[in-house]
């Protein structure tokens, strides 16, 4: 049985932890407001650009001179997967959920006899995936030192991917990230960004009608690389908001659990103290009676 001193130390320790988790919850809440606002602002732009690309591509995706970013390499042998996770922990199941979805895709690729290549964005993703897929990881990226998510970071990733694609180092590129819904819910997403899915283009072809100048081919050649960077940027914004929402929820649960533990330990401390006092009184009374 724990002594009174041990219980006092445990209560003090849990209270100290509770203060930390409460502070982290407040910091995450402040960051969440900004991250959520950025993610919501970025959605209309990325969706509209993607729709324009899909509309343009519906008419030329079968042409021999169609951009490779649209038509692909003609092969489906090497798959490049970009997995977005966090650089910091204490965010609940945020990283675990997206890693789980990515691993399901990895297994499917392996079962089909295709080659897998992985780029991890965020140190937590690398730490988890290196145990099984170390040989498949071709690049690890971290924005730990960046205070905010910015388009230039996404553009750097986009340019690197396009350069590798032009060197025919992969045939298909898919990005994995968490889409922010609310503080409690973040939905793991899987989005193919190279080549553009022709099925999506066909579905979207009748939604909007545009007149293009000079022509679709030239506009597509300029817009496709920008669209890839835009879709990566959107994924990064969604992931950032999801991370802060998950961390806020996790720290809120930790703070409540710490409070409950303090209550239980306090009750145990009071009972132990009462038992010690009762024991001392009995010993005093017994000693007095013996005299």
UniProtKB/Swiss-Prot annotation:
Gene3D superfamilies: 3.40.1380.10, ATP synthase, gamma subunit, helix hairpin domain (1.10.287.80). Transmembrane segments: none annotated. F-type ATPases have 2 components, CF(1) - the catalytic core - and CF(0) - the membrane proton channel. CF(1) has five subunits: alpha(3), beta(3), gamma(1), delta(1), epsilon(1). CF(0) has three main subunits: a, b and c. It holds the Pfam family ATP-synt. GO terms for cellular component: plasma membrane; proton-transporting ATP synthase complex. Produces ATP from ADP in the presence of a proton gradient across the membrane. The gamma chain is believed to be important in regulating ATPase activity and the flow of protons through the CF(0) complex. It comes from the Bacteria. The gene is atpG. This is ATP synthase gamma chain. One of its GO terms (biological process) is proton motive force-driven plasma membrane ATP synthesis. Its main location: membrane. Belongs to the ATPase gamma chain family. The keyword Cell membrane applies. The keyword Transferase does not apply. GO terms for molecular function: ATP binding; proton-transporting ATP synthase activity, rotational mechanism. It is a peripheral membrane protein. HAMAP family: ATP_synth_gamma_bact (MF_00815). It is found in: Cell inner membrane.
